[in-house]
Amino acid sequence: GYDAWSFYYAQCAIVHVNAEEPLCFVRAQDAGGAYIKTYLKHEDVIVYDENYIHKWPRHPYDYLVEIIKERKWDKLSIGLEMDSHYFTAYCYEKIKQGLPNSRVLDCERLVNWVRVVKSDAEIKFMKAAAQITELGMKKAFEAISPGVRQCDAVSEIYTTLIKGTPEFGGDYSSIVPM
């Protein structure tokens, strides 16, 4: 799946009930990650130009609205994750005003509900991640004590987390562990 440190910019998956595959809507800088880390065909990755970023009143969703209109989807019901981080009221207004003939609905955490169902492969990776996390916590209890420099303790913890297990390599975390 798409995995990038780009959640703070406008991006979305566009899923049409009759489309063979979803579309991935991302900024130009993040398109490479979408091409590499998803199974989507290049034409299913919709890239918006950097000129849509911080160029008020232009907004990336202006381009998204154009795409929806080009595909003749502008008179359909459109579900939005209204309680999604970084999906602002301004984003909502851009879509609602740009698609006045559509019915805009809150799909109420639909993505999270779909993500609840895990494949056997996902469960295997989650168990491996839990093992690595447990190793990291054990190392934290060993490394942290009065008089030990914070950087030295963190170095040992990070080493453990990134080293992983003999079967599964670790990785850096998406945010700094606190």
Sequence positions of predicted segments:
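Active-site cores enriched in adjacent His and Asp/Glu residues with nearby glycine-rich loops
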Residues: 1, 86-87, 133-178
